[in-house]
């Protein structure tokens, strides 16, 4: 499901008890969102006749069931990849000449 259509449905439900697909489409077009008719039809089929508060509660329950952090194995892989890249970055940094300090470039803002 696309969250932009769900947000438009929630907004439309503030003015109507049961917003139509045309109502949601009008809100999307008002904020210059390109509307994919197939996706919008699927979203409307899934949420029509349901209370927005219930949809939010169901979504919150599903989100709380998802893991919040990545696994330790994936973190180890990224740490080793970052460790390999560090010496290469240090070597590249040594090749660059140091730039001289610009000082205040003659502006004297706080004199």
Curated annotation (Swiss-Prot):
GO biological process: cytoplasmic translational elongation
Disordered as annotated region, ranges: 86-111
Origin superkingdom: Eukaryota
Presence of the UniProt keyword Nucleotidyltransferase in the record: no
InterPro entries per record: P1/P2_N_sf, Ribosomal_P1/P2, Ribosomal_P1/P2_euk, Ribosomal_P2
PTM comment, free text: Phosphorylated.
Gene3D superfamilies listed in its UniProt record: 1.10.10.1410
Molecular function (Gene Ontology), one example: structural constituent of ribosome
A GO CC term attached to the entry: cytosolic large ribosomal subunit
Ribonucleoprotein keyword on record: yes
Keywords: Phosphoprotein, Ribonucleoprotein, Ribosomal protein
One Pfam family named in its UniProt record: Ribosomal_60s
Function, as annotated: Plays an important role in the elongation step of protein synthesis.
Record-stated family: Belongs to the eukaryotic ribosomal protein P1/P2 family.
Record note on quaternary structure: P1 and P2 exist as dimers at the large ribosomal subunit.
Protein name: Large ribosomal subunit protein P2-2
Native organism: Leishmania infantum
